[in-house]
Amino acid sequence: MGSFPFHRDLQEIASSQLTKALDPEEFRKQGHMVINFIADYYQNIEKYPVLSRVEPGYLKKCLPVSAPYDPEPISTILRDVQNHIVPGLTHWQSPNFFAYFSSTASTAGFLGEILTTGFNVVGFNWVSSPAATELENIVMDWLGDMLQLPKSFHFSGNGGGVLHGSTCEAIVCTMVAARDQMLRRIGSENLGKLVVYGSDQTHSTLQKATQIVGINTENFRAIKTTKSTGFALSPEMLRLTISSDLEKGLVPLFLCATIGTTATTAIDPLEALCHVAKEYGVWVHVDAAYAGSACICPEFRHFINGVEGANSFSFNPHKWLFTGMDCCCLWVKNPSVLASSLSTNPEFLRNKASDSKQVVDYKDWQIALSRRFRALKLWLVLRSYGVANLRNFIRIHVKMAKTFEGLVRMDKRFEILVPRNFSLVCFRISPSALISSNEDDEIGMVNEVNCKLLEAINASGKAYMTHAVVGGLYVLRCAVGATLTEEKHIVEAWNVVQDHAQAILSTY
């Protein structure tokens, strides 16, 4: 690595340094080196502190100020990855990673990504790579079957599915479709009257989508939830909010119901919410980003009962279906509504297949024109493990979460704040564990203690957890979901929690 000497040109580079951008034999050789590097990383992943300990700006001090003029060998680059990049990673695939929701990895997911990148096709329409489009059609119907989605969401019905990069993309696209469908009825001059609904537990993606789509930010409703409903959205509160908006002359447009909220995995009552929405002509999108994967298991499928009343449904296999970033599945009942809002057809893309209306052009189902061949890695995951193994992987995570939950319940200093629905346990040090408790500020003191506990856990490097604040209460989130996590890691994580709790409580 070094500075960029502008006075030199390629003629001055020794012939031995000239390289091809794509050489099959070099790819084979260097590919083996990279795969070995990644395999070694996974074998040694527990040696690293889960949460990176670097300071902001650390990397600029490690790397040159400009790109290298001459080529460098992959061995040198991998050495720098090990020395400079790995220390700056938060190790999401560590078995001691219990933060956020995991982004599960798998051998099949890795290999599928290699194939996707290796082929490097851009499947914006059918003719640009027929296999990319048709495989996506097939795997989306496969997954629809696994989730027991109504036929109205399948290509074999009148619906269909598409792979996006994130839930945000899925919600933006469906909200645009809902917006345009409504404005065709009431006139574009009424854009400022449209209202979007969610709960105070709905992912912030909904608010971002509302802003992107051009809906007045004052018309975004984050309906308050309470502990009495498990922090789920109340159909009665939705009805009251919609009625109030109608009295103001506003137009209810879009509802996002969540199956497995980020904070606590609360379950919005889908069937009842869809019933209310139908009365007012509101588009219902179901966000099951995390928990949707679990619904391939029969024992969790009931959580999406009522989905037949929704207009669209999405979940992220990159969260809990071992597919790797990025992969978001979106199904819609009426693809033509989506396409009418997102379709462009410039002359350079015109072709007989598209004109025949016999094929899907996925450019009309998303924001961007270009798109990756995401279906390939999803196909590899589904085929390599099968439905039975994928269900088993999810059940193992849930079982380990139950183990952690049991350990928490056995220690009287702690309490479980909300019911565990999947593999997330929300817990905290109980107010009763504090010897000196000022009733006037008990909530503040308990929140402070739990905040200190989380900071201590994460600073240890032995585990990484995150927090949520629900109903004004600060809770720790232990999200079991990393592919490599085993029962022993659950026990070790709990030991870390107990040790730091003891040290903190001794000061109160």
Swiss-Prot record:
Its cofactor is pyridoxal 5'-phosphate. The modification N6-(pyridoxal phosphate)lysine is found at residue 319. It catalyses: L-phenylalanine + O2 + H2O + H(+) = 2-phenylacetaldehyde + H2O2 + NH4(+) + CO2. The keyword Lyase applies. It comes from the Eukaryota. One of its GO terms (cellular component) is cytoplasm. Its EC number is 4.1.1.109. Transmembrane segments: none annotated. One of its GO terms (biological process) is carboxylic acid metabolic process. InterPro entries: Aromatic_deC (IPR010977), PyrdxlP-dep_de-COase (IPR002129), PyrdxlP-dep_Trfase (IPR015424), PyrdxlP-dep_Trfase_major (IPR015421), PyrdxlP-dep_Trfase_small (IPR015422), Pyridoxal-P_BS (IPR021115). Bifunctional enzyme that catalyzes the decarboxylation of L-phenylalanine to produce 2-phenylethylamine, which is then oxidized to form 2-phenylacetaldehyde, a constituent of floral scent in petals. 2-phenylacetaldehyde is a precursor of 2-phenylethanol, another constituent of floral scent in petals. This is Phenylacetaldehyde synthase. It comes from Rosa hybrid cultivar. The gene is PAAS.
